[in-house]
């Protein structure tokens, strides 16, 4: 049966997986990888790794990765009344929290709830126009009191996810929670399906990582075992085709996958990625040869695992492919199935290249003469 991008994505979106609670998605990734990979394992932190391609010990090692976790919440306190206080896990958009429907993964199974908001009829002044902070909010699961909530399987530490089943919009767009980064996980499975029947010159490691939304470093144990020569991440990036962002950058939905030139943490440049120009050339040349649309991006405020991967070992050259996404970290993210398909095509083409085409070493300084100090 041929690989279906939409069916795979929608299947992954059915699962809930805040940081540190990725088991449901990990089980799917393990099952799919085991169909065709030469080697599959899950480390103690929860990362899922699948190896494809060359068995030669000196083969070039390309690592392609995406994270399984999504933004969400965690129960902090059960009030005597049965209402639940909670904390954010990762960075769910605070302006969309009040009034959202959520799913709690309780000890006895999923429990539906909603994030309460002061009744509009009694709201005054700023209460009608401003979003409350998380400490002013609560989750209502319909419990009569604290004991009732506990009987339902809820306790301190219960994970909470946003609820919004995937919907297909016009022009091959999809709307759902957790497109960040089930889009990337879908791309991994698409690449796995494509390369499983190819004769590869290199070894390809596909990695579904954990805790990206929480500490961005959950993938580190994989690096120390795989020791990749290059790494390419798959994640989302804000699409700037909406009325509020149309002047910010040229990244657009349905215009191809983004190639990151620069990203960094929104509160300073303490972590981020400046993609080596040689890797940008490799990605753009490969895309050109296979007629795959791509677009460059500079994305302050965006950070992925590449910011930490690049400084492991002797330095790991990193690139990041970004799937444009509207309304990021909200319950209703929107992205394009076409862009996702283009991402899979580009990564498959890269995996099929010979080792000689991968610029592992830095560019030489051939444009000016070097003099000793």
UniProtKB/Swiss-Prot annotation:
EC number(s) recorded for this UniProt protein: 3.4.11.-
UniProt: a divalent metal cation 2 binding residues: 180, 213, 329
GO terms assigned for molecular function: metal ion binding; metalloaminopeptidase activity
Residue positions binding a divalent metal cation 1: 67, 180, 235
Cofactor binding note of this UniProt entry: Binds 2 divalent metal cations per subunit.
Cofactor (UniProt): a divalent metal cation
Catalytic machinery residues: 212 (proton acceptor)
Keywords: Aminopeptidase, Hydrolase, Metal-binding, Metalloprotease, Protease
Coiled-coil stretches: none
Classification via InterPro entries: Peptidase_M42, Peptidase_M42_aminopept, Peptidase_M42_dom2
Domain of life: Bacteria
Disulfide topology: none
GO biological process: proteolysis
First-tier enzyme category under EC: hydrolase
CDD domains: M42_Frv
Entry similarity comment: Belongs to the peptidase M42 family.
PANTHER family: AMINOPEPTIDASE (PTHR32481), AMINOPEPTIDASE SGCX-RELATED (PTHR32481:SF12)
Protein name: Putative aminopeptidase SgcX
Organism: Escherichia coli (strain K12)
Name of the encoding gene: sgcX
């Amino acid at each position: 049966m041929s690989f279906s991008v939409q069916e795979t994505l929608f299947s992954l979106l059915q699962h809930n997986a805040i940081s540190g609670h990725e088991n449901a998605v990990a089980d799917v990734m393990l099952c799919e990888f085991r169909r065709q990979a030469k080697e599959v394992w899950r480390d103690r932190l929860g990362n899922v790794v699948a190896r494809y391609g060359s068995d030669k010990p000196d083969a070039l090692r390309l690592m392609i990765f995406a994270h399984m976790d999504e933004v969400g919440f965690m129960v902090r306190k059960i009030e005597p009344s049965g209402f639940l206080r909670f904390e954010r896990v990762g960075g769910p958009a605070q302006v969309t929290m009040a009034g959202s429907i959520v799913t709690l993964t309780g000890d006895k199974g999923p429990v539906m709830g909603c994030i309460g908001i002061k009744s509009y009829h009694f709201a005054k002044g700023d209460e009608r126009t401003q979003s409350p902070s998380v400490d002013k909010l609560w989750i209502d699961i319909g419990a009569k009191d604290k004991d009732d909530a506990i009987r339902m399987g809820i306790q301190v530490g219960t994970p909470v996810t946003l609820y919004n089943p995937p919907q297909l919009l016009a022009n091959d767009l999809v709307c759902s929670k957790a497109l960040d980064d089930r889009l990337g996980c879908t791309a991994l499975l698409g690449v796995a399906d494509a390369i499983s029947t190819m004769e590869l010159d290199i070894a390809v490691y596909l990695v579904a990582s954990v805790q990206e939304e929480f500490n961005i470093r959950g993938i580190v144990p994989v690096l120390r075992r795989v020791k990749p020569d290059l790494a390419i991440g798959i994640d989302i990036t804000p699409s700037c085709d909406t009325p509020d962002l149309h002047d910010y950058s040229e990244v657009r939905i349905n215009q191809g996958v983004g190639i990151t030139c620069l990203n960094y943490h929104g509160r300073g440049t303490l972590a981020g990625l400046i993609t080596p120009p040689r890797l940008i050339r490799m990605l753009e040349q490969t895309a050109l040869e296979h007629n795959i649309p791509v677009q460059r991006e500079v994305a302050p405020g965006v950070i992925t695992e590449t910011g930490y991967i690049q400084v492991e070992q002797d330095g790991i050259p990193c690139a990041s492919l970004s799937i444009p996404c509207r309304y990021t970290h909200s319950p209703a993210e929107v992205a394009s199935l076409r862009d996702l398909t283009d991402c899979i095509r580009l990564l498959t083409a890269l995996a099929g290249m010979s080792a000689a085409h991968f610029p592992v070493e830095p560019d030489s300084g051939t444009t000016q003469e070097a003099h000793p100090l």
